[in-house]
Amino acid sequence: MDLTKLTAHELKDILSNKEVKAEEITRAFLDRINLVDNKLGAYLYVSEEEAIKKAKEIDGKIEKNEELKALSGIPVGIKDNINVKGMQNTCASKILQGYTSPYDAHVTEKIKKEEGIILGKLNMDEFAMGSSTENSAFKLAKNPWDLERVPGGSSGGSAVAVSGCEATLSLGTDTGGSVRQPASFCGIVGLKPTYGRISRSGVVAFGSTLDQVGPMGKDVEDCALLTSAIAGLDKKDFTTADKEVPDYKKSLTKDIKGKKIGIPKEFFGEGLDEKVRKSVEEAIKVLEENGAEVKPCSLPLMDYALSAYYIISSAEASSNLARFDGIRYGYRSKNFKDAKDIYLKSRSEGFGDEVKRRIMLGTYVLSAGYYDAYYKKALKVRKLIKDDFQRVFKDFDAIVSPTSPTTAFKVGEKKDDVMSMYLSDIYTVPISVAGVPAISLPCGMIDGLPVGLQIISDYFKEDVLFNLAYSYEQSVDFYKMRADF
């Protein structure tokens, strides 16, 4: 039995039945990382000793017949912008190279409380800015389905770790599609929860009104398991909602008969690969066969979402990243004459090109004379986009679309074409701007590469997403796919 290919719920079953020890599971994953990660590039840091120590503790509890917790013995990888006490937290940036976190993020605390085994920190686009993980300052992450292709981004390492069987579960962050798009490219399941469903405390900020921590897993049940474990109110993050967290597993098997699904024409227009369109349309038919009522709908302001997103997120990034100045921690240039020179050279040398591009754009739209023309207008557009979604959700339980207009593209193909790279998130960005939840799951294969189906629902309706996603998933075999790597 290859333990690395099993889902979290399968591992839980064999652990509780004492068919395997937590230490065996952990060592199997550490061996897998040592074997393949030099080619896949998922990890920036591996916590081998700590993981084995934690696994032995769990085995001791099992020996005493103590009740297992939600994540007991399950190997988890954490994106390298989420704090784990005692581990590096670099955001895949030279400017934070060598920085070790002195505390746990709220989501990390919850994983530890539920006895998940944290294997290490995962590769990403620098400061979560990118759609291919080519913007990492340290190494490339590659798609397990085809090493010449990108895994998506910015949570590329998180997707690769699960798809490449280097972790059972992982955490990413999603600002404009950074969990869903790599999940689509790598053939796994990824959730962007409602803004405020999961705490951002201890997560390095990119766009504070957009960022959300998102769980990733091999199937829908795994994703639901991790979401239930980490969601909920956090007094250290005032944007979290004081709403009860349901046991999402209970929503999986409910009948979807009578669920109303909208198909927005704006998500099926120009730029969508025809083979991707066909895969998504076939998935919609499966949902219809399972009892859902499918009708067309319209979200007319979606054409403005990408522009609004890049103005708002870049403005927030320019403010959030001002703290990285080479003074208190992180990279400091050695070639400086005075204090001003430290700031200038440390940031110029420490940040990568994409981060600098967004800082400059954000600073520009917040500057006197341009604030009203760009930033203020973008906020107005955002409000209208939210209203658009609210109007549609009065008539529909969910909306279905492609996750990305294409399958995974080749490494280097879009690196120098900024607009083409940004357009790879055209179907995920509107959801982030509105703050509603969405899930991506595999719905087909094109030339050996996975295709992602995106299901979107109203605020705090993650249970609806899991219900519809599970109904589709169990009707097809795509969730059983594993990259032959």
Swiss-Prot record:
One of its GO terms (cellular component) is glutamyl-tRNA(Gln) amidotransferase complex. Pfam families: Amidase. Belongs to the amidase family. GatA subfamily. The keyword 4Fe-4S does not apply. Allows the formation of correctly charged Gln-tRNA(Gln) through the transamidation of misacylated Glu-tRNA(Gln) in organisms which lack glutaminyl-tRNA synthetase. The reaction takes place in the presence of glutamine and ATP through an activated gamma-phospho-Glu-tRNA(Gln). It comes from Clostridium botulinum (strain Loch Maree / Type A3). It is an enzyme of class 6 (ligase). This is Glutamyl-tRNA(Gln) amidotransferase subunit A. The active site is at K79 (charge relay system), S154 (charge relay system), S178 (acyl-ester intermediate). Its EC number is 6.3.5.7. It catalyses: L-glutamyl-tRNA(Gln) + L-glutamine + ATP + H2O = L-glutaminyl-tRNA(Gln) + L-glutamate + ADP + phosphate + H(+). The lineage of its organism: Bacteria, Bacillati, Bacillota, Clostridia, Eubacteriales. GO terms for biological process: translation. GO terms for molecular function: ATP binding; glutaminyl-tRNA synthase (glutamine-hydrolyzing) activity. Keywords: ATP-binding, Ligase, Nucleotide-binding, Protein biosynthesis. Heterotrimer of A, B and C subunits.
